[in-house]
């Protein structure tokens, strides 16, 4: 036992690791609150499972989309903290992007150097950092087809609202690869306990709503391949950012987690405060590939630096061609271009038609609407970037 829970002197007293008790987590999980689920196909090991077809029918109208988003947000906040969408991406798109990721991995291996991993032994598995930008530069048309996905956008809007920022990191757990230790994710999931204790209590509650974690299965993932382990409802534990470091909590997670097999093209989204860890791949011949999505609120900042102007310039011809063919590429624009107007230089970049100046995404959408050339878009983006510089 780590220590006794002591009542805080005020509602804003700092949380302390010494006050973390497994008993408190166990009691919370024994009496979970569960939202009313209207659109699920099934519930598996406490986790709502939505079918892509069911969701697409439900979000065909603005009212329907808002209703679904409200349900997904409640699942993430007050429910189990996680949901699965089966068949979220088409296999053809997945296979093309998987091939691109394999090429990137091969190229980066040839360059040498160690690739770190936050929660697993470095070098055991394969990682692609900033996979979003690397995919856009190497395979712009595949990027557009992948990130034009309406269900990735649905999950992102449900938790974060509009203007979200997408980053991605590819994780390949090789045969025999050992899984991760239990953790929470960005932001406070990436600070030491000593630093985490310095953040006020309300920031512990704020951190999870700044980010949505997701993963796209790029291959079939039966349990023996080590799909991610989760502890449903653990995102509600107030001391969780301090607790997951503690041995007793790690042991509790090992004994009580759930593990959902996934099929290629399935997507899982979860609250970043949910206790979770990638599993061990006990197979001898399956390289388990997942594209890990980290979607950030426009009110926060993403973990990775991403050259979004470079991405947009690279994929713009593909955006034009897909638009001309009648495809909706707005979600791909949202995943690539900066969708938030601030910070900016308000002496130069002043609001014209509203409370804020146009965003980079606005520039791209306007260019697409006009059928502007790549060169014209480049000039507009340069002017826009110059206005935003102090």
What does each model-found stretch correspond to?
Residues 1-78, 332-343, 347, 351-390:
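Fe(II)/2-oxoglutarate
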Residues 29-193:
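Non-heme Fe(II)-dependent double-stranded beta-helix
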Residues 91-93, 174-176, 222-224, 237-238, ...:
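Flexible loop/turn segments at secondary-structure boundaries
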Residues 96, 227, 241-242, 280-282, ...:
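Short conserved micro-motifs at the rims of enzyme active sites and ligand-binding pockets
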Residues 154-155, 180-181, 188-252, 257, ...:
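Catalytic core of non-heme Fe(II) oxygenases with the double-stranded beta-helix
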Residues 170, 214-216, 291, 295:
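A structural signal for short, well-ordered beta-strand segments
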Residues 243-318:
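Catalytic core of Fe(II)/2-oxoglutarate
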Residues 295-346, 384-388:
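Charged, cofactor-coupling segments
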